[in-house]
Design a protein with these regions (language model features):
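N-terminal positively charged helical leader segments and presequences
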Residues: 11, 48-74, 79-81, 132-136, ...
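N-terminal basic/disordered segments at the start of proteins
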Residues: 26-67, 88
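Solvent-exposed alpha-helices and their adjacent loops that cap or buttress functional pockets
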Residues: 28-34, 56, 75, 98-100, ...
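Structural motif
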Residues: 37-39, 60-65, 103-106, 154, ...
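Conserved mixed alpha/beta catalytic, RNA-binding, or beta-rich assembly cores of soluble enzyme
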Residues: 55, 143, 167-269
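Feature captures the catalytic cores and cofactor-binding loops of soluble hydro-lyases/lyases
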Residues: 68-92, 98-102, 124-128, 132, ...
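N-terminal glycine-rich phosphate/adenylate-binding segment common to multiple enzyme folds
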Residues: 90-170
């Protein structure tokens, strides 16, 4: 990993408070020591797979609940037990885990929130149980943002004696670090762009609108909302035909590490390249880089610089 020592000096001093490198996510206790059983509530993508491998290597017993239509095929083989559960059957999640002696769980992976919340046939495709209906009226009827959804799920699991824990603890070596992480260096224009855009991203995240903005020549091209980062990248590329724009991605101040931690992977880099981006600025300590070495290699190969920005500032 090249350039961190020299290029970290290019990060503005306002980004470098004493607590800067600790990130802004809510810090939760680490998983209990092995062989304590851990529940894994898994959506889609490779993150649940990587966490399962890490937990298994650490010596934990893994009891996995795969969300219907979301989980990856290789996941059952990495877990001691596996069961598919309905996406909106949240009342059953805690009961199933508690029944087999699980008191701690990690919830990770992708779920298409747009389809889940706004599909006209959502109640037919994903029939909710009574716990989900109750959670809707307590938490989500007036606020459907990610933190409200997490609170509803955590509360329901807690009723069954299952506590959600820090989803990044098993993979802390996969988090973004301060400074330039790639051999490929950002241009002066790209540095100016992420310095310009970062305070705006912080405001977007405080409102829990999204976790990313796209910027070029000190002008915001796109803001992420419910569509997710991949679709937002595609939209930014369509709006900005000029090459070399920058994507800034971070975590909401006070964000809860129990779920929805900002995540990028090799596909993110490939999507950025296809859309004409030239730089990716990530919140250091707050963004997961799935298979980090592969991500950095892909970025260098495709000419995209990746910079970690400490985020403990307002």
């Amino acid at each position: 990993i090249g350039g961190i020592g020299g290029w970290i000096l290019r990060i503005p001093s306002r980004f470098m408070s004493p607590a800067a490198t600790t990130g802004v996510l809510t810090i939760l206790p680490d998983p209990p020591p092995p062989p304590t059983p851990i529940g894994l509530i898994a959506g889609g993508g490779q993150l649940p797979v990587i966490i399962a491998r890490s937990l298994k290597q650490a010596g934990h017993v893994i009891h996995c609940l795969g969300l219907s239509g979301q989980w990856e095929p290789e996941l059952p083989g990495l877990c001691d037990t596996f069961r598919e559960v309905g996406v909106l059957k949240i009342g059953s999640w805690g009961k199933l885990l508690s029944k087999i002696g699980v008191q701690h769980a990690i919830m990770v992976g992708k779920v298409d929130k747009a389809k889940l919340m706004y599909d006209p046939l959502r109640l037919v495709r994903n029939l909710p149980d009574m716990a989900a209906v109750a959670a809707w009226y307590r938490h989500l009827r007036n606020d459907r943002r990610s933190h409200a959804l997490l609170s509803a799920i955590a509360e329901e699991l807690d009723r069954s004696g299952v506590a959600l824990i820090d989803s990044t603890a098993p993979i802390d070596d996969e988090l973004a670090t301060p400074g330039v992480m790639t051999e490929h260096q950002p241009s002066a224009a790209q540095i100016a762009d992420y310095e310009f855009a970062w305070p705006m991203l912080m405001q977007v995240m405080r409102l829990d609108i999204g976790q990313a903005v796209a910027v070029r020549e000190r002008d915001i091209i796109a803001v992420e909302a419910v569509e997710g980062t991949d679709r937002m990248i595609q939209r930014a590329g369509q709006l900005c035909k000029a090459k070399g724009w920058t994507l800034c991605k971070g975590a909401r101040p006070g964000h809860d590490r129990r779920s929805d931690v900002p995540t990028i992977g090799v596909r993110t880099i490939e999507n950025l390249h296809a859309a004409g981006a030239g730089c990716l600025a990530l919140a250091a300590g707050d963004c997961i880089m799935i298979e980090k070495r592969r991500v950095l290699d892909a970025a260098d190969r495709l000419g995209i610089s990746i910079v970690g920005i400490p985020t403990a500032f307002s």
